[in-house]
């Protein structure tokens, strides 16, 4: 049983709201981004995302469901041929709303709603993370026999650094002394 939406209606009546959302969605799919008032953009977002989800499925039944809401066959074709396959690997979040400056005439809060055209990096990041984990796992297995040799090597490096540290300190002191001598020779005004 159809139930009316909660809250105030855009345009006054529910039929006008349905027509308004259908026209806004048509413009969004046709142009990729539209500028409208903020309440209209917020109402359009779930409406458009449900239509994109239908387009991702791509079946005839889904096309007919979308045609019930969007009457422009060219836009529906674009939705199913281009927009749906583009978002095939994305789980929701197909649109973004960006607030812009208020409208000049009546100071109404305005927003730009647009289709997100950037690919997500999460799939690439997950793949890179899996590759890195598998490489780390393959390196950990043969490194266990070498673990006993590493502490001895680290002690030798530490001893070498301890001998080199006093020599470095003496060189630093010599450089500081020459800088002081240069400062004494400089003419003072």
UniProtKB/Swiss-Prot annotation:
Instruction: Please name the Gene3D superfamilies in this protein's record.
Output: Ribosomal protein L17
Question: Where do the record's region annotations for Disordered lie?
Answer: 126-189
The GO annotation for biological process reads: translation
Which residues fall in a compositionally biased region of kind Low complexity? 139-180
Coiled-coil residue windows: none
SUPFAM superfamilies according to UniProt: Prokaryotic ribosomal protein L17
Which GO MF term does the entry hold, naming one?
structural constituent of ribosome
CC terms in the record's Gene Ontology section? cytosolic large ribosomal subunit
Q: Which residues cross the membrane?
A: none
Please indicate which superkingdom the organism of origin belongs to: Bacteria
Instruction: Identify the keywords attached in UniProt to this record, alphabetized.
Output: Ribonucleoprotein, Ribosomal protein
Similarity annotation: Belongs to the bacterial ribosomal protein bL17 family.
What does the subunit section of this Swiss-Prot or TrEMBL entry state? Part of the 50S ribosomal subunit. Contacts protein L32.
Q: What is this protein called?
A: Large ribosomal subunit protein bL17
Gene name as annotated: rplQ
